[in-house]
Amino acid sequence: PILKHHASAILTGALKNMMGLTTRKTNVTFHLGSGKRNDPEYLAQCIADLNLVRKPDLTVADATEFITGNGPAGPGPMKKLDLVVASTDPVAVDAFGATCLDAAPADILTVYMAYEHGLGEMNLEKLAVAEFEV
């Protein structure tokens, strides 16, 4: 996925990317199922729960240039980092994505809920990070 802002989920990254595996009907349920359109807490819980069903084996996320507001469709402010992030931990990818949006990982509900489910680590200080130039 391209790391970016999302109006309801705040962040589109590894965790939300798994919504691409669902049917249109399921996607609509995620957005409307609480009875309130695009309820952030309900959507975040659905996304975290979906990742319990099938956690990604590897996420390669594009953080070269991305929208930081009014996403995902825009128009909105852009940020250029020229980075690609890869990990077997989708929570870590999205925790990093949160920092790209100048947010604390725990403030992104999908990250926090997935962390609480035991799907990965949101504390970036606990992770081994390797950087490569290409």
Regions flagged by a language model, labelled:
Residues 1-134:
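Extended, low-polarity segments enriched in aliphatic/aromatic residues
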